[in-house]
Amino acid sequence: MNKTIDITLSPHWEDRISNEQKLRRNDQRSVFQRDRARILHSAAFRRLQAKTQVHGPGSANDFYRTRLTHSLEVSQIGTGIVAQLKLRQPEFRHLLTSTSLMESICLAHDIGHPPFGHGGEIALNYMMRNHGGFEGNGQTLRILSKLEPYTEHFGMNLARRTLMGVLKYPAFLDQVHSKYRPDDVTNLRHLKSIEWHPPKGIYRDDESILHWITAPLSEADKTLFSTFRFQKENDKVHKKTRFKSIDCSIMELADDIAYGIHDLEDAIVMGIVTRNQWQESVASKLAECGDEWFEAHINNIGDKLFSGLQYQRKDGIGGMVNALLTSITIQKSTFEEEQSFESELLKWNAYLSPSMSYALNILKKFVGQYVIHNSEMQRIEYKGQQIVMEIFDALNSDPERLLPENDKREWREAKESGTNHHRIIADYIAGMTDGYAQRLYNQLFVPI
């Protein structure tokens, strides 16, 4: 058995930004069990059932996954990763103590994504281009820490470690944005989505919450945590952050596995991809990926996936998920020759083996090529993009007339205090489901 690594975490990782005096008789739940309950029972989480994952709600086929079912599957995979890591590397068991923590992080990871998937995200980023931008992960942190009405001012008031776990990109959007900025369009229908993909990060409006989350870190760790990946100089490419907590690294792997495999299952069932496409773009490459399991079983997996029999397809999907999940190990987040983190939460991350990382990238690229960038999917995304931009334009033209009362009050308060009142409009639209946004669009623009 491997020697246990001495891991001592500061008790401040279980702190909440606001002390609570809840009337809860004989409540024996842990901090992270309470976090999980808050997320699961939140309105923002429930709304994920009517938000686009890949195939929008209202599709002709009800088999597809929504943001909500995707989040549930990410949670299941994430806790599975934790369980196998505890067995495979028991020396880290004191770092991976809580299943509820991982469930909380995974359930919450997509909670800030707007209606109509990436089309909605691009639309809001364009409309907020002069007011701090918009990005789904940054919106997730904002909902959890400010917007969800579990408390008056602090959102769900989650534990610091939970918030650190959803912090995939610990930098502000203006720090990672490319130097190049496209010209504004004169007609919203002419907006090219490829030019307005947001960088990954959080809003300047939420600077105080980032400082609170990272408060237990040493100054050296804070500096290292904020560094970017090395990349060639290119004025048109956004920078990317390099580091995240171990909890976040597990969630991100679970998210990637769910995207690469479960979204593939949706595409097979709905007839979007064919056996020939699978063979050419995936099977032929995985047969030589360097992993013994994939090389030995890839042909059999293809037979199962395209057999037309649900139990066979499920067996093939489950086999791939298991193969990826069981190839994950905990390693240092920095190179040997580099300075390492002092905090154990940042010193270690979860990683796929190189061959399995290659295999997962092949699967993700396949989903991207044949599903996400499928012309039919892109038309749906374009339509959603137009709906979101038109709604924003209307609300921003006369907020006092068109915003709901609560949002109108917040907009007034922001404007009077000199803070970013445009963010209130973005928050309102980002919280909409696909269906609600469509109905509001019809109410505003479709003749009676």
Curated annotation (Swiss-Prot):
GO terms for molecular function: dGTPase activity. Keywords: Hydrolase. It holds the Pfam family HD_assoc. Belongs to the dGTPase family. Type 2 subfamily. Residues 67-260 form the HD domain. NCBIfam families: antiphage_dGTPase, dGTP_triPase, PRK05318.1. PANTHER family: DEOXYGUANOSINETRIPHOSPHATE TRIPHOSPHOHYDROLASE-LIKE PROTEIN 2 (PTHR11373:SF40), DEOXYNUCLEOSIDE TRIPHOSPHATE TRIPHOSPHOHYDROLASE (PTHR11373). This is Deoxyguanosinetriphosphate triphosphohydrolase-like protein. CDD domains: HDc. Coiled coil: none annotated. GO terms for biological process: dGTP catabolic process. It comes from the Bacteria. It comes from Aliivibrio salmonicida (strain LFI1238). Gene3D superfamilies: Hypothetical protein af1432 (1.10.3210.10). InterPro entries: dGTPase (IPR006261), dGTPase-like (IPR050135), dNTPase_2 (IPR023023), HD/PDEase_dom (IPR003607), HD_domain (IPR006674), PHydrolase_assoc_dom (IPR026875).
